[in-house]
Amino acid sequence: MKVSTAITGLLFLLVLNMLLGAEEIPKFGKVSDEELQMTAIPEDPEADAVVLFDVGDLRIREGSEKYYLTMERHTRVKILTEKGKDYASVSIPFWHEDRIHDLKAHTVLPNGKKIKMDKKAVFEEKVDKTGYKKFALPGVEVGAVIEYTYKLESDYLYNLEPWFFQNNEFTRLSQYSVIVLPYFGYSVFFRNTLDMEPETEDILDPQQRRKLTRYIWRMKDQPPIRKEPYMRTLNDYRAAINFQIREFKSPYAYHKYISDWPDLVKEMREHYDRNLDDDKSLKEIVQSEAPDSLRAPERIKKLYAFVRDQIETGERGYRAVEKSPEEVLKDRQGTGVEKNLLLVNLLMLAGFDAHPLLISTRYNGRIVEQQPRLTQFNYMLAYAKYGSRTYVLDTRYSYCPFNLLPVDDLVETGLVINKGTGGFIQIPKPRALNMLHCANNLTLSEAGHLDGEAMVRFEG
């Protein structure tokens, strides 16, 4: 399992330049004859395209009033088949408050002719808190090379931009570099790859007249990761690197951030506690919808049905909430997460052991429990216990029956955010009415043949 390491702005300062520096990346528009004449690659002869290189350079900068980060990305792809032309349609995701600018893209035909993308071809879409910059490169044909570059700017320094070293097609070179200021310390998490020691370069910050370190992670000749049946998300399988702030230490201030699961639980509990309350209107709902005269399971069911049916669902929501349960009740509208926190609040006022439960939905990927990383979670459910029974509830969809979760919530584990150190729980599986069991005992021969026996059992 991948274990976190740490970097700071001055880490490895004494061993600078002992390792090789970053590879020389061709400038935008400088496409070689070899790239133009390529018709296939020996590593993947059936490939529809090949990622010639995908390079990201991230840097934390110090402005006059704030710190911020910039990330410059440069991607070049060779189109090998008709199907490969689909890669000319590009979608760049970004957090809704981030900015993308200096976007350039063009197509280089096999004869060397360049077709520049019109800036009017770029448009933007938003889904919940995520934006997408979308465009289609012009004049793409088999044998062409497509290339684009852009800059992302963000004020969000808690988690640096993650990086995936693998794509849907074979990747010749994937490289990510990070420059942080001396005040910042980050934990580094690897997934689906062995931990990599970064290469380092010594650079000069001309504004502050100080030395900084550029950390470089590079992977070459990476096989493609393609969508397969029953696969939740490609991100469960792609080699990746993630960053989460560990500390900030300047001459004037010091702040310690998340370093383990209890830290994470404490931080999120403080956020939710700031919104939980015992407002009169909430108590009145408990008394009217779930009086003490009802049995406990029925009270839980009644409160669930009230929030599900009487509060309109806006966006899906993320981990955090912007409106308190009192405000959600007053507006009769909230995100899925805000509705679930309202349910938690009502259950607590009704005397139940109830807490927020963080999960990573199916499309977001599986949780790595050895990595205390907040960005692994993208949604929050309501969790309650009564006696030996556990209830995990999501009020987002009006069609969802009591104690039955929507498909995207059907994951293995969730993190209980209680007033202690929290902990992972197994999310109850729905009762199966029909089931198919398959068991195979197979032997793979040196010639590549599978021999053995299979047993199939139907139930229900």
Which residues fall in each region the model found?
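A surface-exposed beta-strand-loop module
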Residues: L103-F164, T200-R238, A439-N441
